[in-house]
Amino acid sequence: MTEEMSKESPPPPPTSFSSLPDDVALDCRARISRFHYPTLSLVSKGFRTLIASPELEATRSFIGKPENHLCVCLRLYKNPNPLWFIFSPIPKQKLKPIVPWFPNQQYPQYPTVVSNGSQIYIIGGFVRRRRSNRVSIFDYRTYQWRRLPKMRQPRVYPAASVIDGKIYVIGGFRGSMPTDIENSGEVYDPKTNTWEPILLTSLDLTVQNVFKKKHYFTTKACLVINKVSCLLYVSDGKLYWREDKEGFECRKVYGLAEQSSNLFRVVANSGGGGRVTVWWKSMTKGCEFDCLLTEECETKIWCAEISLERRGLRELRGFVEWSKEVFTIDRCDYIYDFISQYVTVTY
């Protein structure tokens, strides 16, 4: 036996995506959670092109892979602009920053945020202490920010809702409504990329009913339990609820004894139906009164997902599905309302 024959043959090189047929490679990538797309887009220019391609979305739709993702906007100490994060699914359960950041401009104060499929709309708000008519949009399919045409009127924290794919916006003025009724409300049509006025007196019943049931509070969540709309909110660090109608008494959510030591600060809708997420902070590593100057402190943001069960007319019981630290800040962060907005994107 010769020396060459005695040597073992080297193992074959691993199969790469580039060696697969295009349709097979496309099908494989379509089955990967969108949460990993930002990382995949860093692999190569070819990956970035494919992730933004309509063919990938068409394949995902064909194989039935829509996903709900909870997105939160955090206000952090010493950061002039809030930062948007996407909440990773089980098992990681971590906040992952959205890249790129908000475009090079001041993030508005008190905007209204709504979602439509894979897109997040940042509507109005204060920019340099003045009401703004700007509308920015972030698309999770392409991971890009872009600016929409300006609204007809500057608005701060207006009522807004997505109806039949169009963005309806009402109010948000200083004091009472403007004397010009045509400017009190407007609607954005993505197909024409234009804003058009709407008359409040001419809104159909569907639009009116949607706005009556709409809630615009970052510290509250609204969901349907046993076919009844319920409003949940945080008060004094605890979770409370009431039916979403006038005259119904507010009551504490039972079953959360294991979380009694945690002071909840925010409640948000979860990506799944019939559940909410509650958020709170903890500070460690010798956090003293002057830690804001020394920064010898660590702040942790925690989240728990709670499923809810209605028991009779007067009791709502919560069940903790999981509870976990989701984000760490290497300093003290005393901002109380650290979640300024949240939405759920579906795509």
UniProtKB/Swiss-Prot annotation:
Check the UniProt entry and state the signal peptide residues, or none. Answer: none
Q: Where is the stretch described as Disordered?
A: 1-21
User: Is Repeat one of the keywords?
Assistant: yes
The Kelch repeats extend over: 119-165, 167-215
Matching entries from SMART domains are given as: Kelch (SM00612)
- Record's keyword terms, sorted: Kelch repeat, Repeat
> What CDD domains does the annotation carry?
F-box_AtAFR-like (cd22152)
Q: Which InterPro entries match?
A: F-box/kelch-repeat_ARATH (IPR050354), F-box_dom (IPR001810), Kelch-typ_b-propeller (IPR015915), Kelch_1 (IPR006652)
Q: Which residues form the F-box domain?
A: 14-62
Per its record, how is this protein called by name?
F-box/kelch-repeat protein At5g03020
Q: Which organism is it from?
A: Arabidopsis thaliana
